[in-house]
């Protein structure tokens, strides 16, 4: 089949790589425009655009994907993975077989923009990938294929996204194979079972140390390595970012929620139930440091707070 591909971040680039290794032809790639990125705010291309140029594929980066509807109509299907815009009907139905989306959850669970982070933050032990034929709703289209993936207890959001992208690429190729052969079956979603995964906000980043240690750990790993969970200390101007933690299971005295204890190059924080060990953190304007390196140059006493 000849397909058009729309996607933007690294998740989508991984899906595109898998598609390029299949027997299907990618006739067009659509990605978001170049934009200022990183701490230096230098203009840079998104990962999908970089991959398209590297592979010599036709590339469009319109302000609105609707501008590409005419080009999309020359393809058998439009494939979407984390593109970053809601598609209007003129784009959804432009290709001969419509549009198919690779979504990083087991729909109808976790519809929306942040399914990977939300699943980990909720302590889910399993997630997956769903390929749907897109309709005009938010991740509401009929299911073409699902693949289940376990979530290990210490896996980060970045690690899970990478895994789901690889699984999603394989699932997408299988869907296109079935679509081409006329054997693809679609199943309606049960919207009564739907849950939602809105974009991560600043409030979602703030650590509440009065929660259970496992929930705090899940929040930190969900937001690592790109977003970061945040906390504050009276002696530090601005938020501290916490990048890696583990639930501390060794015997020791209980710590009050937010209370700090440092020793032997290790840093512990009390929670409502249990203790979290901070493994990697970052001061405002600084670089990420392991706990031992951080403690060699800094001293934190007292308590952390929201």
UniProtKB/Swiss-Prot annotation:
<dbReference type="InterPro" id="IPR002376">
    <property type="entry name" value="Formyl_transf_N"/>
</dbReference>
<comment type="function">
    <text>Attaches a formyl group to the free amino group of methionyl-tRNA(fMet). The formyl group appears to play a dual role in the initiator identity of N-formylmethionyl-tRNA by promoting its recognition by IF2 and preventing the misappropriation of this tRNA by the elongation apparatus.</text>
</comment>
<dbReference type="Pfam" id="PF00551">
    <property type="entry name" value="Formyl_trans_N"/>
</dbReference>
<dbReference type="Pfam" id="PF02911">
    <property type="entry name" value="Formyl_trans_C"/>
</dbReference>
<keyword id="KW-0808">Transferase</keyword>
<dbReference type="GO" id="GO:0005829">
    <property type="term" value="C:cytosol"/>
</dbReference>
<keyword id="KW-0648">Protein biosynthesis</keyword>
<dbReference type="InterPro" id="IPR036477">
    <property type="entry name" value="Formyl_transf_N_sf"/>
</dbReference>
<protein>
    <recommendedName>
        <fullName>Methionyl-tRNA formyltransferase</fullName>
        <ecNumber>2.1.2.9</ecNumber>
    </recommendedName>
</protein>
<dbReference type="InterPro" id="IPR011034">
    <property type="entry name" value="Formyl_transferase-like_C_sf"/>
</dbReference>
<dbReference type="GO" id="GO:0004479">
    <property type="term" value="F:methionyl-tRNA formyltransferase activity"/>
</dbReference>
<feature type="binding site">
    <location>
        <begin position="105"/>
        <end position="108"/>
    </location>
    <ligand>
        <name>(6S)-5,6,7,8-tetrahydrofolate</name>
    </ligand>
</feature>
<dbReference type="InterPro" id="IPR044135">
    <property type="entry name" value="Met-tRNA-FMT_C"/>
</dbReference>
<dbReference type="InterPro" id="IPR041711">
    <property type="entry name" value="Met-tRNA-FMT_N"/>
</dbReference>
<dbReference type="InterPro" id="IPR001555">
    <property type="entry name" value="GART_AS"/>
</dbReference>
<dbReference type="InterPro" id="IPR005794">
    <property type="entry name" value="Fmt"/>
</dbReference>
<comment type="similarity">
    <text>Belongs to the Fmt family.</text>
</comment>
<dbReference type="InterPro" id="IPR005793">
    <property type="entry name" value="Formyl_trans_C"/>
</dbReference>
């Amino acid at each position: 089949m000849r397909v058009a591909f729309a996607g933007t971040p690294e998740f989508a680039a991984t899906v595109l790589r898998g598609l390029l290794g299949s027997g299907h032809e990618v006739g067009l790639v659509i990605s978001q425009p170049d934009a200022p990125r990183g701490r230096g705010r230098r203009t840079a291309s998104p990962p999908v655009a970089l991959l398209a140029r590297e592979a010599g594929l036709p590339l469009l980066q319109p302000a609105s994907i609707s501008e590409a509807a005419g080009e999309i109509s020359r393809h058998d299907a439009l494939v979407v993975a984390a593109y970053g815009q809601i598609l209007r009907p003129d784009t959804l139905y432009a290709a001969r077989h419509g549009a198919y989306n690779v979504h990083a959850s087991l729909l109808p669970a976790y519809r929306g923009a942040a399914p990977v982070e939300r699943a980990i933050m909720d302590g889910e032990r399993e997630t997956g990938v769903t390929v749907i034929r897109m309709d005009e709703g938010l991740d509401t289209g009929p299911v073409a294929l699902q693949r289940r993936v376990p979530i290990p207890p210490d896996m980060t959001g970045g690690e899970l996204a990478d895994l789901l992208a690889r699984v999603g690429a394989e699932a997408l190729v299988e869907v296109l194979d079935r679509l081409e052969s006329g054997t693809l079956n679609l199943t309606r979603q049960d919207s009564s079972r739907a849950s939602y995964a809105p974009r991560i906000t600043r409030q979602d980043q703030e650590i509440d140390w009065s929660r259970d240690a496992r929930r705090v750990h899940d929040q930190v790993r969900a937001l690592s390595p790109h977003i970061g969970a945040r906390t504050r200390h009276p002696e530090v101007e601005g938020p501290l970012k916490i990048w890696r933690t583990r639930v501390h299971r060794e015997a020791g005295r209980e710590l009050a929620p937010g209370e700090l204890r440092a020793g032997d190059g290790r840093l512990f924080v009390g929670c409502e139930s249990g203790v979290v060990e901070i493994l990697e953190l970052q001061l405002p304007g600084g670089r990420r440091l392991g706990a031992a390196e951080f403690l060699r140059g800094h001293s934190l006493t007292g308590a952390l707070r929201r």
